[in-house]
């Protein structure tokens, strides 16, 4: 079983960008924790990060061919990217939306996700633990 983990815009800056909101953990550290859990679960993961909406759409399309599920942090695209929403809807595999921060306790424009209604699940506000829960959920939904 393979799960694709997609990190959206600005997540490459984790550890430096607003640590009071996102914590001090880096993207590399998140990916390492995910790899450790994947080993325990007996699943393969492929982690990708992009600041480009179009590239994320392409990666979601690729996931439909190469993976059994997706863990997806769309970053700021969460709030307005109908292209990503349509891609999640179209791929036909379990997709868990995840956010480090609680988007519902932040600025008004961040309190709405256009992705959540078409995702299999939505986890936010739990920091790195949210990613680990999302990986467990994706694996369970994909059938392990």
UniProtKB/Swiss-Prot annotation:
PROSITE patterns: DEHYDROQUINASE_II (PS01029). Keywords: Amino-acid biosynthesis, Aromatic amino acid biosynthesis, Lyase. Its EC number is 4.2.1.10. One of its GO terms (molecular function) is 3-dehydroquinate dehydratase activity. It is an enzyme of class 4 (lyase). It catalyses: 3-dehydroquinate = 3-dehydroshikimate + H2O. Pathway: Metabolic intermediate biosynthesis; chorismate biosynthesis; chorismate from D-erythrose 4-phosphate and phosphoenolpyruvate: step 3/7. The record marks 17 as: Transition state stabilizer. Homododecamer. Belongs to the type-II 3-dehydroquinase family. This is 3-dehydroquinate dehydratase. The gene is aroQ.
């Amino acid at each position: 079983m393979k799960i694709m983990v997609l990190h959206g815009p600005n997540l490459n800056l984790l550890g430096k960008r607003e640590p009071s909101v996102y914590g001090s953990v880096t993207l590399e550290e998140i990916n390492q924790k995910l790899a450790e859990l994947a080993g325990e679960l007996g699943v393969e993961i492929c982690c990708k990060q992009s600041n480009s909406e179009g590239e994320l759409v392409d990666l979601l399309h690729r996931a439909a061919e190469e993976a059994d599920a997706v863990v997806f942090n769309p970053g700021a695209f969460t709030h307005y990217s109908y292209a990503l929403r349509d891609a999640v809807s179209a791929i036909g595999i379990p997709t868990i939306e995840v956010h480090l921060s609680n988007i519902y306790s932040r600025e008004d424009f961040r309190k709405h996700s256009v992705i959540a209604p078409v995702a299999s699940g939505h986890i936010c506000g739990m920091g790195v633990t949210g990613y680990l829960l999302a990986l467990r959920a994706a694996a369970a939904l994909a059938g392990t």
